[in-house]
Amino acid sequence: MARTPSTMLELGTKAPAFDLPNYNTGTGEERVSVQDAAGPRGLLVMFICNHCPFVIHVADELARLGHDAKAHGIGVVAINANDTHKHPADAPVHMTEEAAKRGYTFPYLFDETQEVAKAYKAACTPDFYLFDADLKLAYRGQLDDARPGSDEPITGKDLRRAINAVVAGEDVGTDQKPSMGCNIKWKPGSEPDYFG
């Protein structure tokens, strides 16, 4: 299992726009944009997928964290940008199944063109981007220290600490560890400059 780190997009970056189809039928929206997704206190964008062991390892915590963040005024979306021709387990029909199985209460969007992932400079699954109420990037980094095969408990402590700071209107700080996971599965010939 290859380990790919986050690119660590520059803090303060404005949330890149998106308007993508939603495959979590439990949330009701057919399409979701940045404006739709943002809460009064901010927005959490998570690049995930169905098959990556790094995502599977923390999926239950993602469900809990998504619920908790929304309760504190942070909008939450997950985006799958993987090439589904090479990785059919990540196809939209399976996204719907995964969202229901995990109890995701947030939209699960499909970035078929992979342009949104490139705009965020997303590199791995999971990859997290937390924006403040002005939709400026406050945190990009890991959920916590847990990894498949490690004994670290899955607590979401790093991302939860950042969410608490954003909700309180406080600075998150710049000491942020990159997320780590499977690389996004780019379509052949579509790999971004920052990949590899």
Q: PLM features: residue spans?
A:
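Chalcogenol-based redox active-site neighborhoods
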Residues: 1-176, 183, 190-196
